[in-house]
């Protein structure tokens, strides 16, 4: 969150289940707008749906994964720059592949996302590809002298241990706050 908060207006957490478990984060928590834990695409779709429901004067929503501690600090800036060449859905790419949960989503795509979910689509990458998403390349980042994929994902205890080993004690404490 600390990597994205200076670059966006409001931060909102998408999570299903009891929202009070995230109270210490001080964020609004929204659940998927479709039932039955319909996968990552439902989480992505929750953002544009929230903006449309609130009738906010926004054209795009940025989504990031909460378990990716090294994502680039210039992510939003570079996504916005990509819009200048082609105003559409923008997603991240690195040497490890496409990372479509990291995206800049046009609010106008909310009905199409909802339709895709109702038709059984669950994969963010497959849907983004169908939409002709623009991919923005991000090179490896240096973390304590080691080059790592900027979208390194903490998907288990061993990944968490690896991420903690890469962080300085100061950065680790800042991330815990």
Regions found by a protein language model. Name each.
Residues 155:
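Active-site rim beta-loop-alpha module in soluble metabolic enzymes
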Residues 1-150, 161-175:
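Nucleotide and nucleotide-moiety/phosphate-recognizing core
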Residues 158:
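Conserved active-site and cofactor/substrate-binding residues in soluble primary-metabolism enzymes
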